[in-house]
Amino acid sequence: MSHSTPFKIDVSSRILRLPPYLFGRINKMKYEKRVAGVDIIDLGMGNPTDPTPDSVVAKLTEAARDPRNHRYSVSNGIVGLRREVAEKYRRQYGVTLDPESEVIATIGSKEGFSHLCLALLGPGDTIVVGDPAFPIHIYAPAMAGANVIRVPLGNDQAFLDRIERTIDGLYPPPKLLILNYPHNPTAMTITADFWDRAIALCRRRNIMIVSDFAYGEVCFDGYQAPSFLAAEGAKEVGVEFTTMSKSYNMAGWRCGFCCGNAEMIKALATIKGYYDYGMFAPIQIASVIAMREHSEFPPEQSRLYQHRRNVVCRGLDKIGWTYDKPLASMFVWAKINPEHLKGQDTIDFCLRMMDEAAVALAPGKAFGDHGEGYVRIALVENDQRLRQAMANLDRALNPRQPRPRRAKAATA
């Protein structure tokens, strides 16, 4: 039986209003190159390659053998995990949290952030975020139906002044300000007084704050990233997301947390209660062990990233790109020499580098208009691979003429 009219799938306006996913072309070429047998050095994704602590993996295995742990968990996280998160905040940042009402476990911070946007935002609402920005900070509010206003990124009073001037021109005023320090993709950092000023601004304007603190424990050269929740009045106006992904090399485990304002946590818990039954219990149990028994691990991992940062920065000096040496995160944000771009935008440039240098980079344009001209370099490979990547880029961008051979002296 034939049908003259093809069946049409009509997707929702929620999908249609999403901005283009600019990493798509990069990921497609990376896949095709690898299928063809090309050894691509992937510095484009912040995906840790170092191992999780052995005892954490052992605890996961042990817990997975207990049939009781194969049942549904609870959507807000087991009580032992929430208590451990609260204890870590007390120990590390001097913050007091009620594990029952001010802490919730999420299936990675991206899931938690996305569901929080559904809980707080809807059509007609507006959020403000810096540009460039981690893509989910744009996509999740858009999927919730909210308008996204981007303000050129900064880490000082001038940035907050730009935000306030932007708010003055908006009606109704925005509901949410999204802040992310140490920043992804730029690795920009702040001092503690930034949070005091941001909280004062948001209290004046009745705007909620969401702090993405995913890289809070990945710090270099003695720098210590300040937690939003350590600032006076923080819990009155907002929440903070953290994750096990970067500090303990548990990215694929998908274990994150949201802490802070009890009403915002309750709204997130309500949404999660409809959407999921929480993460696999053995992952939660192993995460408790990671935080309780491995307080030395995040600083050790940070020292490793600091060393890799130095390797990459030396390579960039040779290539001829500029950068601000990062004090935190697992990225270097580098400005491409305009001569190397050859008139291309950063997406086409990164495609060319994958072709000519077998190196995958994250194009700055994928993070926003103010990222154009930059690339994000992830410190996820070992020293040898990082040096090779820098050498490959240098050869592709700065071809050097071979030295002429000396003529041999004539003999009689």
What function would you assign to each model-found segment?
Residues 1-11, 15-21, 26, 31-41, ...:
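PLP-dependent class I/II
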